[in-house]
Amino acid sequence: ARDRAAVFYLGDETLKGFLHIGTSSIAVLPNEIKSFSWSPDGKSLAYLALKDNLINLVIADASGKNPKTTFRTPITDARISWVSSEKIAFQTAPSGLAEGFIFAFARSSNAFSKVYGPGFGLQSLWSPNGTQILLSQAARENGGIKTGIYDTAKKQYAALDVSTLTDKCVWGGTKEIVCAVPRDIPALTVLPDDWLRGEFDSGDRIVRIDAEKNQSED
């Protein structure tokens, strides 16, 4: 939504949030929202809120009004991405020391299903059309990172010849990805943990990836 933004901040040790709408209007969001995502068309929003030891998926209009709980899950560390009008993706918290998963919630059927996983250090970045996922995972055999593209329709994974985190990438349409790629990953680095803690200075180079041909160039 171009005319509005969701703002979150820590106040009195409580995570608070609000919507800044247009030039002057503000709508307060519930406290302690765990994750937030706009719908692809910007007309709705979704967020996760903890209640009775379950994570509630709540959908509201773009002003935060008319909230409705549509799904509950015990995956309390999940983060969401509204990847298509029909599908909201759930990603477990990434750690190179734990297996991660990606799930999808189908709005029309209320079905909740696994999309990908397990994978240590699993991170994801969905394509704008919600059909492909850029994935990064811990390469436990050498302590680095392996990066690839997963086609959700064909259920096929294609490895890329770059090693980077999805946090360092952005889709440019549905066919191109631009990434900052670490020049070196020291031994014993735990990713993405060290990166998320600000303890990994990667010294990146910029790489452009053709998502159709799975080829990259500086």
Name each region found by the language model.
Residues A1-R4, I26-L48, P67-Q91, A111-S136, ...:
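Conserved beta-propeller blade repeats
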Residues K213-D218:
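Surface-exposed loop and turn segments in beta-propeller and other repeat-based domains
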Residues L10-L15, L50-I55, A93-E99, A139-I145, ...:
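Short, solvent-exposed loop/turn segments at conserved positions within beta-propeller repeat blades
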Residues L19-G22, A60-A62, F103-S108, T147-A153, ...:
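Beta-propeller blade signature
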Residues L10-D12, L50-K51, A62-S63, S108, ...:
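Solvent-exposed coil/turn segments that connect beta secondary-structure elements
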Residues F18-S25, K51-D77, F90-L97, F103-S108:
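Short, flexible helix-coil linker/hinge segments at the edges of structured domains or between repeats
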Residues A180-D201:
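Short, conserved, GDST-rich strand-edge loop motifs in beta-rich repeat architectures
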Residues A1-S24:
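Post-signal peptide N-terminal segment of secreted/secretory-pathway proteins
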